[in-house]
């Protein structure tokens, strides 16, 4: 489940609780969806858009190739970047035996995409 607008039945909240507080911006919705499915909840997806929002400021994105490497490194551990603690938590929870590779690869891939 990936979404900014999600309706969660009370019964699901009773079953698995609320969002994991480790996720400050990224992956909280996906983690919740995985936990809900594991607990037996059904996930329904709307057939179209249910909302719209303005895109993030490009100059705040850590993968922006227009920024210096130093500035991108500063931005990577911000809520709109790829913050280390929640990314580590998500990789460890869902990455299987290769979770360290999954964790590191997300940063390598992001920096490679910003270079090429």
Task: Tell where the protein language model's regions lie, with residue ranges.
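A recurrent flexible, glycine/aromatic-enriched loop bordering the glycosyltransferase active site
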Residues: 1-11, 74-75
């Amino acid at each position: 489940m990936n979404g900014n607008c999600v309706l969660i039945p009370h019964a699901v909240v009773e079953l698995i609780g609320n969002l994991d507080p480790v996720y400050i911006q990224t992956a909280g919705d996906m983690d919740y969806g995985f936990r809900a499915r594991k607990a037996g909840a059904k996930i329904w997806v709307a057939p179209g858009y249910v909302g719209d929002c303005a895109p993030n400021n490009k100059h705040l994105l850590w993968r922006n190739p227009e920024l210096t490497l130093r500035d991108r490194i500063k931005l990577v551990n911000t809520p709109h970047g790829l913050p280390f603690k929640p990314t580590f938590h998500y990789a460890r929870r869902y990455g299987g035996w290769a979770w360290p590779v999954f964790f590191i690869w997300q940063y390598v891939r992001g920096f490679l995409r910003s270079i090429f």
